[in-house]
Amino acid sequence: MGKRDNRVAYLNPIAAARARGPAPTSGTTIQDYLSRPRPSWEEVKEQLEKKRKGSRALADFEDKMNARWKKELEKNREKVLGGGDKKEKEKEKDKEKEKKEKKKKEKKKSSRHSSSSSSSSSSSDSSSSSSSDAEDDDEKKNLKKKKKRKRSSTRKASDETDSESETDSRESFKKKRKKTDGEKDKDEKDSRKKRKAERSQSESSDESDVDKDADSKKKKHSSEEKEKITDKSKKKKKKKKHKKHSKKKKRKTSSSELD
């Protein structure tokens, strides 16, 4: 038997492509792209000039936005300047008040000095004015003392309420702690009982498993021994049969030889 011929004729792929001819075109080709209509240089210049100038709509939009921004800037400037003017006015008012108070104090001092050097009538007038001033000072002092007492009483009351609230909060916290501790102890006791029960169950199950394994091993051992005994008995029977058969053959051969 000869080998089968599996040879295949070799084809040059380039030669095969030339023989097929040009492939059918689908869509545009490179020649179509190269022969596309192109604008002239003058048209390109016009387009560039239009881009440089920009569109009218964009210019109008920019003008509107600039006008809005100008208005907003003017409003913000007015607000800032108005706020600065108000602050300056307030400062001027404070300065004027201080000046008036200083003038009043100077007048009082001058009136006191003039009362000591003037006549009895003027002294009586000055004494009345000084007594009125002293009364005013006493009233002011009394008012201040009353305010201080009220503040101190309110502070004491607030301190007492705070201390009472603190004691109440401490007592409530202690009670909550005791409750939580008792609950934790109960949970721990329950968990311990459960663990003990689980352990006892696991130990009993392990013992039962051990007993089962021992019984199964004993059964296997007894079954293996029985099989061994049966195998031995079978072998003995076979040996006996073989011996009987060999004796019969020997007898036949001896009888044939005698004949």
Curated annotation (Swiss-Prot):
Family of the protein in this entry: Belongs to the FAM133 family.
Lineage summary: Eukaryota, Metazoa, Chordata, Craniata, Vertebrata
Coiled coil residues, start to end: none
Biased composition range(s): Basic and acidic residues: 39-49, 59-99, 180-191, 211-232
Biased composition (Low complexity): 113-132
The protein's name in its UniProt record: Protein FAM133
Organism: Danio rerio (Zebrafish)
Basic residues composition-biased segments: 100-112, 142-154, 233-253
Region (Disordered): 18-259
Annotated InterPro entries: Fam133
